[in-house]
């Protein structure tokens, strides 16, 4: 019997209980807190990447926005490491679950919106009505801007889910095609396998890029509200 194409996206269970919580906690092991005075190469590389990313993320923020630095860095490290671990064979990628991505996107989006209404109430309300709007269009524009505001967390979650899921499905299909072609034509199977390797390299880049894009959009939402 052929394996279900979406079997790899099913939440794994142990004795009937989902173990996704353990899987989500696993990436934290990859970033240990060093106890030595002199860091090794891996820790130094991690610190350099964090400093480089934090400079790019926080350059546009004022002092109030920079208080979110730890949250943003933790977010990009968590999503990036989770996406990369999901590329390992026979592994599970939590970021292919829309429910989990919504669980990250909605609280972060709500936090930025609440921050804006608490500290910049007039400016936040002004976003619902662009300056110079004709009076007859005011009700319609308010409704449109309200809908666009509430669509933001959904767009965050769907973008991450769709990109990660599409890559995994494509790798699954090309890998299955390479195995099927081995009995038909070895040369075509080798070409297909080469395409699979190139796609895998591309998926490594996509995993990191999607983590950066997700965090960058949260950072931009925060910038608009601080």
UniProtKB/Swiss-Prot annotation:
It comes from the Eukaryota. GO terms for biological process: proton motive force-driven ATP synthesis; proton transmembrane transport. The chain crosses the membrane at residues 12-32, 68-88, 97-117, 138-158, 164-184, 200-222. It catalyses: H(+)(in) = H(+)(out). GO terms for molecular function: proton channel activity. It is found in: Mitochondrion inner membrane. InterPro entries: ATP_synth_F0_asu, ATP_synth_F0_asu_AS, ATP_synth_F0_asu_bact/mt, F0_ATP_A_sf. Belongs to the ATPase A chain family. PANTHER family: ATP SYNTHASE SUBUNIT A. This is ATP synthase F(0) complex subunit a. It comes from Felis catus.
């Amino acid at each position: 019997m052929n394996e279900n194409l979406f079997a790899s996206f099913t939440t794994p269970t142990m004795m009937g209980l989902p173990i996704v919580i353990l899987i989500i906690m696993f990436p934290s092991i990859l970033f240990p807190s060093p106890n030595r005075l002199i860091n090794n190469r891996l820790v130094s590389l991690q610190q350099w990447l964090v400093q480089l990313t934090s400079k790019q993320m926080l350059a546009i923020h004022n002092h109030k926005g920079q208080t979110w630095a730890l949250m943003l860095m933790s977010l990009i490290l968590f999503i990036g490491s989770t996406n990369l671990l999901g590329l390992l064979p026979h592994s599970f990628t939590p970021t292919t679950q829309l429910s989990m991505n919504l669980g990250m996107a909605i609280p972060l989006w709500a936090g930025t919106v609440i921050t804006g209404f608490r500290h910049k109430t007039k400016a936040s309300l002004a976003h619902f009505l662009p300056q110079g709007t004709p009076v007859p269009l005011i009700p319609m524009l308010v409704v449109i801007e309200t809908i666009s505001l509430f669509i933001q967390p959904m767009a965050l979650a769907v973008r991450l889910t769709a990109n990660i899921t599409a890559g995994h499905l494509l790798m699954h299909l090309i890998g299955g095609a390479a195995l099927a072609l081995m009995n038909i034509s070895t040369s075509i199977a080798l070409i297909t396998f080469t395409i699979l390797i190139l796609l895998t390299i591309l998926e490594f880049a996509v995993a990191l890029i999607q983590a950066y894009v997700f965090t960058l959009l949260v950072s931009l939402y925060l910038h608009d509200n601080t």
